Curated annotation (Swiss-Prot):
Record's keyword terms, sorted: Methyltransferase, S-adenosyl-L-methionine, Transferase, tRNA processing
Keyword tRNA processing in record: yes
UniProt binding sites for substrate: 159, 191, 228-231
This protein's GO CC annotations: tRNA methyltransferase complex
Pfam families per record: Methyltransf_4 (PF02390)
Function according to Swiss-Prot or TrEMBL: Catalyzes the formation of N(7)-methylguanine at position 46 (m7G46) in tRNA.
Catalytic activity of the protein: guanosine(46) in tRNA + S-adenosyl-L-methionine = N(7)-methylguanosine(46) in tRNA + S-adenosyl-L-homocysteine
Signal peptide: none
Family annotation (InterPro entries): SAM-dependent_MTases_sf, tRNA_(Gua-N-7)_MeTrfase_Trmb, tRNA_methyltr_TrmB_bact
Family according to the record: Belongs to the class I-like SAM-binding methyltransferase superfamily. TrmB family.
Protein name, per record: tRNA (guanine-N(7)-)-methyltransferase
Native organism: Mannheimia succiniciproducens (strain KCTC 0769BP / MBEL55E)
Pathway(s): tRNA modification; N(7)-methylguanine-tRNA biosynthesis
Keyword S-adenosyl-L-methionine on entry: yes
Amino acid sequence: MSEQKITFADQKRKTVETAEFTEDGRYKRKVRSFVLRTGRLSEFQRNMMNDNWADFGLEHQNNYFDFAEIYGNTNPVILEIGFGMGKSLVEMAEQNPERNYLGIEVHTPGVGACIAYAVEKQVKNLRVICHDATEILQDCIADDSLGGLQLFFPDPWHKSKHHKRRIVQPNFVDNVMQKLQQSGFIHMATDWENYAEQMLDVLSQSKALTNTSKTNDFIPRPDFRPLTKFEQRGHRLGHGVWDLYFVKN
């Protein structure tokens, strides 16, 4: 039997899932906000990544992205962290051609599915990255360069001992604030009430942010946010859904 060819998509998956070690060979443990799941990368998803990465994919680099060059315009760039399978992200890109969208997802099946849907919808204002979002924010995105951040249904890490793994922490918000332009927004949504309260607390601590909620907590579900599979799951389980929308002063 001939050996299966290792494609670009396979190598990308291997790179993302490789553990990190110090120079003397000891495991370098990092507190991450995501779990590297082992879902199968389908042949279709693999082909979509291999065939369309040049059009949709960006790589981690040690200098800032030139968004005007990448997108061919100076429209606002909206960053979404953890787009899952990418359907809602592609829908937003399709519905808002006056905006550019940049999605980050560490799970290669989701990246492949997102690219496939983007090809189907023929969107031109979307790029995706398969890498740790904290490193992308730090290394690749210039200060005052983002029009907004979207974080929809992040991993809730529901056990108290794992709350430190939740991505929404004061230092994360501080990092995002540096990257946002004035009047840029932070839009979060979750179906875990405890996490919603934490999001509200962390965002409210920043004096540079204004809560757009009339009740100074959560906003009604906005029509412009597409219904995601996580939200549908939450409805089936009887969960509420909480949206937060803050703007940089």
